[in-house]
Design a protein with these regions (language model features):
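Formylglycine-dependent sulfatase
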Residues: 1-285, 289, 293-330
Length: 330
């Protein structure tokens, strides 16, 4: 869609949407790909996943040297300067795999953390260092935008794909659950936006989804969306206007994790009410999130519960099964 609006499109970093044709980045709307086809790396420095090398420059297999976070930062900065020379604006999706396990920050970054916090645990220290290293990379990318004269006309969106992982000693604050859960600790994350000279410095607590990013960008570039999508444009919210974003059903589904036996984890929310099944072998739980943000006191079934349940079932029907990609064999 961004290409229809005249944009050059690129993805740097983690793809995780397919390992072979027709599910490769260059076949899915991106003019340029420099990154990793897989999900997580077994090592941030060898970049291998179960013995396979999924690093690519477009479709060419490559074997770059260095920490993955530094590589993705450098590649994004290089792209920004090259894109500046073209006569078209650019859309860049930069996907770091940090701070996903394995927790392998560069040694010098871990030393900085332990110098400040000598009593920090081994695991927590590595996690903090991995995040700070990535944060430095984001800063370097923003500096590249500024040096290339493109910061003033670039909207930057930064967010996480899930809540922190307690096995890595992440801290999700007072909310229940962590990565992999349907509780808010697993699915509710902060999102930061920056557009120099266009967005006020402020905080809003509206509920928005990752799926809202696409229609928002289309709205921003005045590109109509004529097919069914799940998200809504939140451009009025960015323009400091009042906007209701929770007057709709919001869905979360997870199908991929091995310990759920091919079944699903699900959640649906409407305004302050939330219905979830955190594991397919556990009962449904129903919460009022305004009164019980820690999701500790399930409610009894009522009319709203019935509406949420029907919406969840309808979402099953519309979404259907998702075919798995054929696994590669070595």
């Amino acid at each position: 869609m961004m290409k229809k609006a005249g944009y050059q499109t690129a993805i740097i970093g983690k793809w995780h949407l397919g390992l072979e044709s027709p599910n490769l980045p260059n076949e899915r709307g991106f003019d340029f790909f420099h990154g990793f086809l897989g999900d997580m790396m077994d090592d941030y420095n060898t970049h291998l996943r179960r013995g396979f090398n999924y690093m690519r420059l477009n479709t060419e297999e490559i074997d770059p040297q260095g920490h993955a976070t530094d590589l993705f930062t450098d590649w994004a900065s290089d792209y920004i300067f090259k894109a500046r020379k073209q006569d078209k604006p650019f859309f860049l999706y930069l996907a770091y795999n940090a701070p996903h396990s394995p927790l392998q920050p560069p040694v010098e970054w871990e030393k900085k953390v332990r110098k400040r916090h000598p009593n920090i645990s081994e695991t927590r220290g590595k996690l903090v260092a991995l995040i700070e290293h990535m944060d430095d990379g984001v800063g370097r990318v923003i500096n590249s935008l500024e040096k290339s004269g493109q910061l003033d006309n670039t909207l930057i969106i930064f967010c996480s794909d899930n809540g922190g992982d307690r096995k890595s000693e992440a801290n999700n604050g007072p909310v229940r659950g962590d990565k992999g859960d349907m509780y808010d600790g697993g699915i509710k994350v902060a999102c930061s936006l920056y557009w120099k000279g266009h967005l006020e410095h402020r905080r809003v607590n509206n509920l928005v989804m990752m799926s809202d990013i696409f229609p928002t960008l289309c709205d921003l570039v005045q590109l109509p969306v004529n097919h069914r999508i799940d998200g809504i444009s939140v451009l009025p919210l960015l323009r400091n206007q009042e906007q209701v974003t929770d007057d709709r059903y919001l869905f979360w589904v997870r199908r991929e994790h091995g310990d759920i036996g091919g079944k699903t984890q699900n959640a649906v929310r409407y305004k302050e009410y939330k219905l979830l099944q955190n594991r397919p072998f556990e009962p449904l739980q129903y919460f009022n999130m305004k009164q019980d943000s820690k999701e500790s006191q399930p409610l009894e079934k009522d009319a709203v519960y019935s509406k949420l349940y029907k919406a969840m079932v309808e979402h099953y029907r519309i979404s259907g099964a998702i075919p798995w990609q054929r696994p590669l064999t070595k």
